[in-house]
């Protein structure tokens, strides 16, 4: 097609194709990325003018999931896509994080990157295609961008890295890793893992980076060809606004000694975050007043002067803190580079919840609460992936009072959703299977105080809370946030960073795991990337910090409680013949409704015949179980029953061996007069009367399928058989009835 550029690279055995010039021609840059059967249109557009009055780069990334991409029609009454799903929000963050550091720090034009998923191949996840597309679209546009970057996902199967694993390979993988970077450096790492050791994790990251180098070269070639065809724009030469040297000298002369004094006093006197912020704010105001005193003419001639002075003061503050760390090995709160803030752990903090854990590390404090529910409480995921659900959920709340602010509380933002997902991913491999623990599990982390690393505080609080709730997790998990200060060849890696170190440092590297290995990892950086040696040091230092924190957790609660909270529901389970499900449900759900009304329990019936009963009242649960047993029990030939005589005839007695329940008929059979006793019986009434309970043995069925019973043979048996059921543990499930509804039918 004339005026259209298409270029293809084979990645992990599948074609990665970039196309431009056909779609979204008015965007600053537009690329259709195709990988396998997945197609994502990514556009990058910038405003004509910079936004006034801001001191940050206004980048927005939107990830738009269109359900037509997966051949689905949206549910609900409106039948169109609404607010982004959690998966879409996390995918938008995944695109944002590696590209953000590559824009000029002084750039103030609004930049909007939109990734629209238009076709989905389950073997080729669209979020990685979205990162590649964003990089390519930005390279085609006139937006200043120090790219390109590439991205891949990496799995680990039999201890071997697998690039861009398929859906089937992913199900066998012990690692779900996304890596993004330039040709020279890694920019972002995001991972969930099943206790992967540090050396294997590093190997997977570096293997991913090797493939990224090919993708980066491919995008550079794509841009060069697009530029030759007039399908790409030249990048403008931008010059960062700077203070006049005389002004810079004046600012440094006034600001440096004053800021240095406050920062060193904060270190030596170990000020709190609020005290340090208060003193620094006062110091900045004093510096600003001294600098601008009597400078009315200069201010009138250069309206940008106050903003430039403010930026330089912040830069000087950053230089002092970083120099102190690099040259003295001491941090702003007086800690050494590897020192972790004081930790306290508590469990059982809330009296009537199912489990609670309070984790405090310095001024960061997180309370995590566990709630257990029936499997019907699991979350159904309605997105572009295969139909699935999750029974373990973690939600993270960051109220304004946690940082001493007074502002309205809104719906959870992208940051809260991202932090919640990270903490969820860290604990997920340790959650017991449904067979072992038949509950839906919801954790909520309330950040009560924040001075850095609240997401890792949520991981530690989650471990405490789950163990307090009696959830038999496979191993405790802890998390720690690592930081980096890098100036040329000088490198300092910080363990357990606080808010100021996060703001003034070069990296926020969060690592969570058990004593055996990593379960979650997330890296965000602000410089042009880090190399293998830095990453290796950070992982090893994080391991030491994680083990230290795990010891603190285990000193508080060495193992999960043996008993659940008295306020948590108890689970009973029984397996029935799948053909008997209709006997429990009844026409229009009549029977199961009746059971629920009479006992007050919750009942889940699975397609494979497993029935789960949840109740906080043990007696009610047992009653519901007995009702279900009665409704579904078959008479077994050779089994002895204690039955009730329902009527007497000349030729024998009819005996009900499985009683009536909820108005539904029981199961009865005939004891022929010849089977009433070992001796000859002249009259049935001489042996049994209507209403009597007698032992009978099921000896078979007649040609019409009617049950034949024998009292004579039962008298020779020494024991009475019992219906089988088990408590608490149950087998896994493949979906099925949810109380009154079948999930597959109701969707």
Curated annotation (Swiss-Prot):
CDD domains: KH-I_PNPase, RNase_PH_PNPase_1, RNase_PH_PNPase_2, S1_PNPase. Keywords: Cytoplasm, Magnesium, Metal-binding, Nucleotidyltransferase, RNA-binding, Transferase. Gene3D superfamilies: GHMP Kinase, N-terminal domain (3.30.230.70), K Homology domain, type 1 (3.30.1370.10), Nucleic acid-binding proteins (2.40.50.140). The keyword Cytoplasm applies. It is found in: Cytoplasm. GO terms for biological process: mRNA catabolic process; RNA processing. Its EC number is 2.7.7.8. Its cofactor is Mg(2+). One of its GO terms (molecular function) is polyribonucleotide nucleotidyltransferase activity. Its main location: cytoplasm. GO terms for cellular component: cytosol. It is an enzyme of class 2 (transferase). It catalyses: RNA(n+1) + phosphate = RNA(n) + a ribonucleoside 5'-diphosphate. Coiled coil: none annotated. The keyword Nucleotidyltransferase applies. Residues 718-747 are annotated as: Disordered. Residues 638-712 form the S1 motif domain. NCBIfam families: polynuc_phos, PRK11824.1. Belongs to the polyribonucleotide nucleotidyltransferase family. PANTHER family: POLYRIBONUCLEOTIDE NUCLEOTIDYLTRANSFERASE, POLYRIBONUCLEOTIDE NUCLEOTIDYLTRANSFERASE 1, MITOCHONDRIAL. Involved in mRNA degradation. Catalyzes the phosphorolysis of single-stranded polyribonucleotides processively in the 3'- to 5'-direction. This is Polyribonucleotide nucleotidyltransferase. It comes from Moorella thermoacetica (strain ATCC 39073 / JCM 9320).
């Amino acid at each position: 097609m004339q005026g259209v550029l298409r270029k293809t690279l084979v990645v992990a055995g599948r074609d990665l194709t970039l196309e431009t010039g056909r779609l979204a021609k008015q965007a600053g840059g537009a690329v259709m990325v195709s990988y396998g059967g997945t197609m994502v249109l990514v556009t990058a557009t910038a405003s004509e003018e910079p936004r006034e009055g801001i001191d940050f780069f206004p980048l927005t990334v939107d990830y738009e999931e269109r359900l037509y991409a997966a051949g689905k029609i949206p549910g609900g009454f409106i039948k169109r896509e609404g607010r982004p799903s959690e998966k879409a929000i996390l995918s938008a963050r995944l695109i944002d994080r590696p590209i953000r550091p590559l824009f000029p720090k002084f750039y103030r034009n609004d930049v909007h990157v939109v990734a629209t998923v238009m076709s989905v191949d389950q073997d080729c996840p669209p979020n990685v295609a979205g990162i590649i597309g964003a990089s390519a679209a930005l390279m085609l546009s006139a937006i200043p961008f120090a790219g390109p970057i590439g991205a891949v996902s990496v799995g680990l199967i039999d201890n071997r890295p697998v690039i861009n694993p398929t859906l089937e390979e992913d199900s066998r993988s012990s690692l779900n890793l996304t890596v993004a970077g330039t040709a020279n450096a890694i920019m972002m790492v995001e991972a969930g893992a099943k206790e992967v050791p540090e050396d294997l994790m590093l190997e997977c990251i570096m293997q991913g980076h090797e493939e990224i180098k090919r993708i980066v070269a491919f995008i550079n070639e794509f841009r060069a060809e697009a530029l030759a065809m007039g399908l790409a724009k030249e990048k403008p030469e931008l010059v960062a606004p700077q203070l006049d040297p005389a002004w810079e000298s004046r600012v440094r002369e006034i600001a440096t000694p004053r800021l240095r004094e406050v920062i060193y006093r904060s270190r030596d006197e170990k000020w709190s975050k609020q005290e340090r912020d208060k003193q620094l704010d006062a110091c900045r105001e004093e510096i600003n007043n001294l600098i601008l005193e009597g400078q009315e003419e200069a201010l009138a001639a250069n309206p940008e002067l106050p903003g430039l002075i403010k930026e330089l003061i912040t830069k000087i503050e950053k230089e002092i803190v970083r120099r102190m760390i690099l040259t003295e090995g001491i941090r702003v709160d007086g800690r050494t580079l590897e020192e972790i803030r004081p930790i306290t752990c508590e469990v059982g903090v809330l009296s009537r919840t199912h489990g609670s854990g309070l984790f405090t590390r310095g001024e960061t404090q997180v309370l995590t609460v566990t709630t257990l529910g029936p499997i019907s409480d699991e979350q159904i995921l309605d997105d572009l992936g295969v139909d699935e659900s999750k029974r373990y959920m973690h939600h993270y709340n960051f109220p304004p009072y946690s940082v001493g602010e007074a502002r309205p509380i809104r719906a959870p933002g992208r940051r809260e959703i991202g932090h919640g997902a990270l903490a969820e991913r860290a604990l997920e491999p340790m959650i017991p299977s449904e067979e072992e623990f038949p509950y839906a599990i919801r954790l909520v982390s309330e950040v009560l105080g924040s001075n850095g690393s609240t997401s890792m505080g949520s991981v530690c609080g989650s471990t405490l809370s789950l163990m307090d709730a009696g959830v038999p997790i496979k191993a405790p998990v802890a998390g720690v946030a690592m930081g980096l200060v890098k100036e040329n060849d000088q490198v300092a890696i910080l363990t357990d960073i606080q808010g100021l170190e996060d703001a003034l440092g070069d990296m926020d590297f969060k690592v969570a795991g058990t004593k055996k290995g990593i379960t979650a990892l997330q890296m965000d950086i602000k410089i042009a990337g880090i190399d293998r040696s830095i990453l290796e040091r950070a992982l090893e230092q994080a391991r030491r910090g994680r083990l230290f924190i795990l010891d603190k957790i285990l000193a508080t609660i060495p193992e999960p409680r043996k008993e659940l909270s008295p306020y948590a529901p108890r689970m009973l389970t029984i397996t029935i013949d799948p053909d008997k499900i209709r006997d429990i449900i009844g026409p229009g759900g009549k029977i199961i409704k009746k059971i629920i009304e009479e006992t007050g329990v919750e009942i889940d019936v699975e397609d494979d015949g497993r029935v789960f009963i949840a109740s906080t009242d043990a007696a009610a649960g047992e009653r519901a179980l007995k009702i279900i047993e009665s409704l579904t029990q078959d008479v077994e030939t050779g089994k002895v029953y204690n039955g009730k005589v329902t009527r007497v005839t000349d030729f024998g007695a009819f005996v009900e061996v499985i009683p009536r329940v909820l108005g539904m008929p029981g199961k009865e059979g005939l004891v022929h007069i010849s089977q009433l006793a070992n001796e000859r019986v002249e009259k049935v009434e001489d042996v049994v009367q209507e209403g009597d309970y007698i032992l009978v043995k099921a000896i078979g069925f007649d040609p019409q399928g009617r049950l034949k019973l024998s009292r004579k043979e039962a008298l020779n048996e020494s024991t009475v058989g019992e219906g089988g059921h088990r408590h608490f543990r149950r087998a896994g499930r493949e979906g099925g009835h949810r109380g009154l509804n079948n999930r597959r039918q109701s969707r």
